[in-house]
Amino acid sequence: TLVNYLGGGDDAAGMARVNKFCQDHGYTSTSMGRLLLADNSKGDNYTSAKDCGKFLKTIYQIDKGTATDNNDTLAGAEYMYRLLKMQTRKNKIPAQMPSEVKVANKTGELDHVENDAGIIYDTAKGIDLVVCFMSQDLNDTAAAQNTIAQDSRAIYGYYNE
């Protein structure tokens, strides 16, 4: 896994490196306490829409060459942006966008959870956007997916129509 790679073959060292990066870059609502889907008796993983949005904004600005803060350096930002553009799950943020609008996003799904964070780009008026949706304790995940799609479309429309 990426965490194992970051830790030089040691998952705990990789998680520590992720947490240090988050602390050093002001992602104050993000922490990695365990590997994905591992028993959470030793810790939990959490983040916020604000931290996800900030991270995506940094990736976008570095890719566009518009980063203004000297702290806005992130090795591999351009590669991360390319990976986000390759997302195959289109049932949330991109679902109701006009066909010419592009979305680079990362979804997250668990039982009773539907998340999506993305960059809406190549828009009608050139106003690119970062949006992030996070949910938990859902009874109807299909309704949540539809709400994310509707809200994304409404946000796009507000700025670009």
Model-based region annotation:
Residues 1-62:
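Mid-domain, small-residue-enriched loop/turn segments at the edges of structured enzyme/sensor domains
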Residues 7, 57-92, 96-161:
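Structured C-terminal helix/loop/strand segments within mature extracytoplasmic catalytic/sensor domains
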